[in-house]
């Protein structure tokens, strides 16, 4: 975590932290004004929101990075697919080398590597066979392709709360219950893209990492969610569900980590959560290498981490599934036995019935299913 991010996520910065963040005070004001103006233009219809021709469920957040949107998007897409819907996920594709519209998966299998699709679309495509994944900055264009070319009849808009150019039928806002707003400020003084009053636009609040939140904080967030949306929140924890090797094949039980000396490799917005996961699994983290969020690892970087891990007496280099799709594939496969990948999923602790009811409402005006297109789009 950089020095700036440390200021962002420190909830009580103290005198020194406040002093360090003071130069950003003047920069926060124009960002706040611009966000408010943009929101008002959408609220009044001056800026239009395009209808997609299929129900849209947006998964987003207020802060930048690390709230747990990807597990939430996986869970929502899987639930929609389980209802017999032809689901497509629309993603910005952060970390991709290209910025044009791309089909990362047509629902029959992944078509693009993470370098072209972005890490989150690549992970979603891998985890959700049968679900199309499209990526690019113009989500309305992606929605049109998904509906007209791929026959999608339900769309999941990943990281879409601020992307108001595409109309949605349900806005799900994910908050990290252990630290939802950081220092409370907007960019660049703090981590938030909008003030918490923006939650009034949401249809549902999803509290991730609810197992890590103090009881009094959790109750306060429940009240905030109910006041903003009229619904109780969904609450979840990040539950480790599988252990994979460097080639992303099953590699035995998660119990294999217990008592093992390991090196942790990550490129996440908030890597401390990954370290806590490893420690909870009983691993001894002897070495930690944290890169910036969405970092595309080079072969040289992976080789260096493997060497350092060997020197530290580590049995494995362990990373997240989201990071694993950004590793050099050939080198990761060659070093498969020295790498381990921890898969995590969102385990619902409370609010499963609330989520189902919210999805029911979003799908209420859904068009009748149409025949799938005759030929896949490449």
Swiss-Prot record:
Ranges in coiled-coil conformation: none
UniProtKB keywords: ATP-binding, Kinase, Lipid A biosynthesis, Lipid biosynthesis, Lipid metabolism, Nucleotide-binding, Transferase
Gene Ontology BP annotations: lipid A biosynthetic process; lipopolysaccharide core region biosynthetic process
Annotated binding of ATP, by residue: 63-70
Any one GO MF annotation of this record: tetraacyldisaccharide 4'-kinase activity
A Pfam family hit: LpxK
Catalyzed reactions: a lipid A disaccharide + ATP = a lipid IVA + ADP + H(+)
PANTHER family reported in the protein's UniProt record: TETRAACYLDISACCHARIDE 4'-KINASE, TETRAACYLDISACCHARIDE 4'-KINASE, MITOCHONDRIAL-RELATED
Protein family: Belongs to the LpxK family.
Protein name, entry field: Tetraacyldisaccharide 4'-kinase
Protein encoded by which gene: lpxK
């Amino acid at each position: 975590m950089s020095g700036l991010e440390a200021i962002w996520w420190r909830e009580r910065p103290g005198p020194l932290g406040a002093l360090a963040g003071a130069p950003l005070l003047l920069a926060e004001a124009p960002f706040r004004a611009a966000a408010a103006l943009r929101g008002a233009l959408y609220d009044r219809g001056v800026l239009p929101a395009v209808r997609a021709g299929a129900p849209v469920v947006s998964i987003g957040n207020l802060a930048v990075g690390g709230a747990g949107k990807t597990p939430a998007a996986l869970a929502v897409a899987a639930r929609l697919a389980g209802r017999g819907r032809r689901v497509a996920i629309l993603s910005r594709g952060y970390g991709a080398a290209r910025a044009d519209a791309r089909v990362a998966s047509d629902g029959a299998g992944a078509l693009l590597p993470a370098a072209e699709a972005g890490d989150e679309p690549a992970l979603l495509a891998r985890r959700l066979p049968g679900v199309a994944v499209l990526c690019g900055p113009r989500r309305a264009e992606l929605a049109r392709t998904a509906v007209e070319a791929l026959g999608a009849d339900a769309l999941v808009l990943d990281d879409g709360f601020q992307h108001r150019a595409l109309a949605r039928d349900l806005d799900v806002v994910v908050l990290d219950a252990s630290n939802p707003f950081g220092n409370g400020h907007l960019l660049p003084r703090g981590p938030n893209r909008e003030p918490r009053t923006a939650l009034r636009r949401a249809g549902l609040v999803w509290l991730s990492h609810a197992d890590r939140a103090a009881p009094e904080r959790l109750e306060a967030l429940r009240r905030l969610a109910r006041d903003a949306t009229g619904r109780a929140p969904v609450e979840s924890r990040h539950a480790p569900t599988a252990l994979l090797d460097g080639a992303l094949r099953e590699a035995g039980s998660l119990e294999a980590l217990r008592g093992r000396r390991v090196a942790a490799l990550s490129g996440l917005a908030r890597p401390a959560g990954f370290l806590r996961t490893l420690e909870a699994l009983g691993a001894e983290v002897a070495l930690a290498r944290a890169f910036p969020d969405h970092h595309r690892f080079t072969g040289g970087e992976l080789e260096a981490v493997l060497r350092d891990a060997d020197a530290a007496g580590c049995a494995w280099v362990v990373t997240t599934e989201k990071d694993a799709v950004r590793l050099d594939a050939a080198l990761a496969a060659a070093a498969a036995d020295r790498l381990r990948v921890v898969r995590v999923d969102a385990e619902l602790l409370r609010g499963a019935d609330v989520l189902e009811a919210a999805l029911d409402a979003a799908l209420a005006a859904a068009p009748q299913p149409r025949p799938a297109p005759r030929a896949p789009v490449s």
